[in-house]
Amino acid sequence: MSPIQAFGPQAENQSPPFSGHNAYRADPLLKDIAADMPRALRDDFETVGKFVASAEAQDLARIANRAVPELKTHDGYGNRIDQVDFHPSWHALMRRSVSSGLQGSVWEGRREEKGFAHQARALRFFLTAGLECGHLCPLTMTNASIAAIMASPRIEKAWAPQVVSRRYDSSNRPAMQKSGVTIGMGM
């Protein structure tokens, strides 16, 4: 015990931090579901499982849930902007989840996911939900929006590449000027 700890109250009934493992490897059901999937997908699940159980990811999730989004109605010059600013930890989680395809991998048509696209997304989603659920809401809405977008070939041509893009773009620009878009959270 360090000299500093000797003077403060000691918490004896707390579990140690739950990080540093692999959430995918630790779940026999997930491994069983993925057993017949291509090796590339199983490797991806390993990567997601390691990240979501890392201390870094858990810190991002904790901070993202404590740092409330802030509405900025005007810029410094009095111009109306109606912009919502999220903490960088929120953007880090979004960036990671978008790069994993949670916003639209089922619509990409990737060869390694052929026949497994929905199951692969569900497995990644399940693992990520164990970390933080709030950022999954806009990703779920984005994934669901593609079916409606596909109802119009003209709209699909314009929007689908932006929506299924695995590049998260948090900039406050028109959608067609962004490298990727999410659809949702316009409440």
Per-region residue spans from a language model:
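Extended, charge-enriched "interface" segments that sit outside catalytic cores
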Residues: 1-114
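Glycine-rich flavin
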Residues: 91-187
